[in-house]
């Protein structure tokens, strides 16, 4: 009788403990999926309103037209609530929706094809059970003919989509392979930092047999810099890479443009191990060819620092710098640690492609708000009141002072970038500063 009682007790405990263990396992998988969604920065493209995360509707301008991100909440009508795991995996890694239509590669499924089954299952668990369903319809993507014909994507996938999951390099350690897996896969760094072809395809998805992977790319007036060691931002130390990805700030530099959003939404949440793994991988990438010899910069005499401090401004660019930039970036171009990035010796400033420095002058910039540095310090925009020749003079001065050897910028370079800036954005900035009323009736902060 006693034995039967003990058996019954153990059976009852087992019945109670099994669901508890399963629930704990499910919770752990959902939490891992949430982390992986951070790594993939899914929220950046699939959110158009902060109060509706992952509900889609964000317009993305491409050379082929406007693509709208889709609702990836577990909503049954407009989201992915009816997706099985296999449906989800096919969309994530092959670019095929549940109903069979092909997704446009603005969704970086070529990179996501490298994501493991284990991580894909964790992502599925998160999006099905950790995300709030939102009943928001998907806007219609509008691409120019013939790119609006999705059947063309069949050929695109045959030509450009990489095959299979990430292949570990046995010659490298675990940390290096982890970094490569993240950079090439979920983090999809190549989507911005690798050159694209005429069909919008990335020219490489890893560094095997090519010198193009992560070598820099310009799109929509922004230049995503070369990430390889010895080139551009690749010149920084591994610790500096970790700090930049965690805080958006490192010694003498800061993120800008879309990268600030990446830090704010994604990389600041990476584990320490993953941050160091990414830094190890990026630090190992060495291009086969030597860096190009910098173009000879026009001399600025007397020395820029001396001239600015003495009030002697022999060029229009120097005067523009003194009027607009000197207070924050200082007369020696050194900036202020963690507040205003240095311009002297800044690889982004002296990049062969000046698009980003022009864009920042035109539209301003904002540092990310992170857990370690919550203040989103911002640089004001000057495009609303500086002409193209003035912006060119200012950019040339910055790119050729304090030992910088960037090539000159001309007004045509500025005009090209300005054409890619939404005119309404500059009008809103002007209204905010001058209290004018914009064409759409929006006043400045104290406008009537």
Language-model regions, residue ranges each:
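Bacterial N-terminal signal peptides
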Residues: 3-18
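Sec/Tat signal peptide C-region and signal peptidase I cleavage site
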Residues: 18-24
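Flexible coil segments in periplasmic/lumen-exposed cytochrome c-class electron-transfer proteins
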Residues: 26-28, 47-67, 98-105, 109-180, ...
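Mature N-terminal segment immediately following signal peptide/propeptide cleavage
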Residues: 28-47
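Short cysteine clusters
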Residues: 42-45, 189-192, 325-328
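N-terminal post-signal-peptidase region of extra-cytosolic proteins
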Residues: 56, 70-75
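A structural feature that tracks compact, well-ordered secondary-structure segments
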Residues: 75-95, 112, 180, 195-196, ...
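C-terminal structural cap/anchor segments
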Residues: 316-359, 375
């Amino acid at each position: 009788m006693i034995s039967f009682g003990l058996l019954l007790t153990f059976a009852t405990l087992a019945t109670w403990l099994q669901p508890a263990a399963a629930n704990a396992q499910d919770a752990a998988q959902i939490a891992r999926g949430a982390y992986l969604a951070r790594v993939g920065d899914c929220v950046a493209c699939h959110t158009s309103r902060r109060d509706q995360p992952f509900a889609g509707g964000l317009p993305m301008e491409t050379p082929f037209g406007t693509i709208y991100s889709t609702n990836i909440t577990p909503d049954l009508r407009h989201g992915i609530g009816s997706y099985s795991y296999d449906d989800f995996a096919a969309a994530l890694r092959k670019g095929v929706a549940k109903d069979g239509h092909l997704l446009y590669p603005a969704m970086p499924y070529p990179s996501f094809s490298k994501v493991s089954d284990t991580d894909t299952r964790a992502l599925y668990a998160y999006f099905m059970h950790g995300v709030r369903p939102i009943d928001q319809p998907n806007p219609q993507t509008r691409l120019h003919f013939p790119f609006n014909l999705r059947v063309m994507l069949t050929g695109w996938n045959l030509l450009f989509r990489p095959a299979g999951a990430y292949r570990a390099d046995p010659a490298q350690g675990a940390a290096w392979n982890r970094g490569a897996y993240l950079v090439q896969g979920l983090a999809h760094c190549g989507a911005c930092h690798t050159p694209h072809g005429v069909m919008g395809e990335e020219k490489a998805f890893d560094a095997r047999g090519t010198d193009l992977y992560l070598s820099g790319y310009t799109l929509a007036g922004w230049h995503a810099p070369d990430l390889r060691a010895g080139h551009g931002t690749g010149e920084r130390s591994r610790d500096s890479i970790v700090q930049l990805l965690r805080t958006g700030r490192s010694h003498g530099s800061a993120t800008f443009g879309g990268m600030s959003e990446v830090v704010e939404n994604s990389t600041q949440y990476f584990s320490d191990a993953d941050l160091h793994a990414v830094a190890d991988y990026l630090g190992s990438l060495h291009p086969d060819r030597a860096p190009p010899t910098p173009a000879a910069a026009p001399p600025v005499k007397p020395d820029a620092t001396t001239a600015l401090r003495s009030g002697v401004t022999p060029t229009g660019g120097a005067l523009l710098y003194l009027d607009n930039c000197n207070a924050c970036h200082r007369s020696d171009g050194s900036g202020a640690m963690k507040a205003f990035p240095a311009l002297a010796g800044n690889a982004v400033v002296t990049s062969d492609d000046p698009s980003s420095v022009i864009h920042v002058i035109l539209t301003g910039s904002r540092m990310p708000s992170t857990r370690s540095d919550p203040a989103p310090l911002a640089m004001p925009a000057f495009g609303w009141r500086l002409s193209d020749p003035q912006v060119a003079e200012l950019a040339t001065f910055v790119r050729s002072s304090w030992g910088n050897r960037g090539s000159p910028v001309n007004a045509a370079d500025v005009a090209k970038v300005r054409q890619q800036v939404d005119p309404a954005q500059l009008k809103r900035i002007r209204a905010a500063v001058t209290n004018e009323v914009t064409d759409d009736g929006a006043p400045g902060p104290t406008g009537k």
